[in-house]
Amino acid sequence: MRTLVYQRRIHLAASPERVFEFHLDPANLRLLSPSWASVTRLVLPPRFGVGSRLEIGVRLLGLIPQRWCVEITRLDPPRELVDEAISGPFPFWRHTHTVTPGEGGGAELVDRVEYRPPGGMLGIWMDRWTTRLMLGLMFRHRHARTRTLLESPETGGA
């Protein structure tokens, strides 16, 4: 089955090191979660490292329960963090967070998700109206929250 890719980038007025450190703190995961994907269970390590696992329970739109177990499979500070689903709703899921210096200062954050949607060929055919739509909504929210949290004067940002 074909692997699909979703990618979104954002420029942040924060150093690449600060952006990377923010993503290394598991507590920030709850801060980035949209309200329509309410976190019902979160078992986190104190800090992410290769081999770290986290368990996440979410309820999409308040109705659809999902359980995930995700493992950090690559860590290249301050540039790259990769997590892969060990179990969850997707047959395959790899999320790569890449942080690089931004043009003119700051940092560029790229979230790249490689995935195989559930439902086989029907899942691939429906991807535009299901998984891709949800990923777009989720990462727009996550990037907006990341910007707020890293750039606001109250949180020590720009």
Where are these regions (language model features)?
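Intrinsic-disorder/low-complexity, polar/charged segments enriched in Ser/Thr/Lys/Arg/Asp/Glu/Gln
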Residues: T3-R9, R53, R67, E80, ...
